[in-house]
Amino acid sequence: MRSGVIAQKVGMMRVFTEAGEHIPVTVLKLGNCQVVGHRTKDKNGYTALQLGAGARKSVYMPKAERGQFAVAKVEPKRKVAEFRVSEDAIIPVGAEIQADHFVVGQFVDVTGTSIGKGYAGGMKRWNFGGLRATHGVSVSHRSIGSTGGRQDPGKTFKNKKMPGHMGVDRITTLNLRVVQTDVERGLLLVEGAVPGSKGGWITVRDAVKKPLPKEAAKPGKFKLADGGDKAAAAPEATAGEGA
């Protein structure tokens, strides 16, 4: 199981195929996504990589966080996230994961925070039909109607769909196809919409419900902290090579 990446949502556009078909895509930017720490089974009980992305001034950080980045010899990051990985998918601390970590055509799961909509009624929040436009209904056309029974059960059950705060939820969109990658600019183009607003932080992982392409790099495509070469593409293509 490979690591995912932290990206920032740039916006949406469309790309054209050779056949003239247009594909709506979301542009995600990998802003210096580096490995800042390891989680091992012996010490932590599980195996994971801690990644960081984006620049942040150390003066605005707690001393404890500054110390963690100092130990890792990595510049302070604005966004930090953990990704569970298998023991054979460990990437060295300080390595920068590239956009070609994902290959064109593979499917990914994208997680982000949805756009906040404030206080919303039942029709907007839950797609309720509302009441009738006429025939005795006045003022309450967009109300939700009854919320429960009579004397039995004599209450409104928990988790009943009602008006309330809408948005700012953690949303995962499954099986989005990778359309293009741009290593030089650190861009990843995925088909369809991605949850969140422009500039929001997004995590991208290999799709859980789709097979990983053979061309995908293992443990990943990355650039070492000392400026070394990136890891080679696939295990069978990297025999005898060092990362």
Curated annotation (Swiss-Prot):
Write down the Gene3D superfamilies for this protein, in alphabetical order. Answer: 3.30.160.810, Translation factors
Question: Which biological process terms from the Gene Ontology are attached to this UniProt entry?
Answer: translation
Q: Which Pfam families match?
A: Ribosomal_L3 (PF00297)
Please note every region of biased composition (Low complexity).
230-243
Recorded coiled-coil stretches: none
One annotated GO molecular function is:
structural constituent of ribosome
Alphabetically ordered keywords of this record: Methylation, Ribonucleoprotein, Ribosomal protein, RNA-binding, rRNA-binding
Post-translational modifications reported in the UniProt record: Methylated by PrmB.
Per the record, residues carrying N5-methylglutamine are 151
Look up the domain of life of the source.
Bacteria
Q: Which GO terms describe its cellular component?
A: cytosolic large ribosomal subunit
Basic and acidic residues compositional bias, start-end: 218-229
- Which residue stretches belong to region Disordered? 139-164, 218-243
Q: Which InterPro entries match?
A: Ribosomal_uL3, Ribosomal_uL3_bac/org-type, Ribosomal_uL3_CS, Transl_B-barrel_sf
Q: Record's family?
A: Belongs to the universal ribosomal protein uL3 family.
Its assembly, as annotated, is: Part of the 50S ribosomal subunit. Forms a cluster with proteins L14 and L19.
Function as written in the Swiss-Prot or TrEMBL entry? One of the primary rRNA binding proteins, it binds directly near the 3'-end of the 23S rRNA, where it nucleates assembly of the 50S subunit.
Q: What is this protein called in UniProt? A: Large ribosomal subunit protein uL3
Q: Which organism is it from?
A: Afipia carboxidovorans (strain ATCC 49405 / DSM 1227 / KCTC 32145 / OM5)
Q: State the taxonomy lineage.
A: Bacteria, Pseudomonadati, Pseudomonadota, Alphaproteobacteria, Hyphomicrobiales
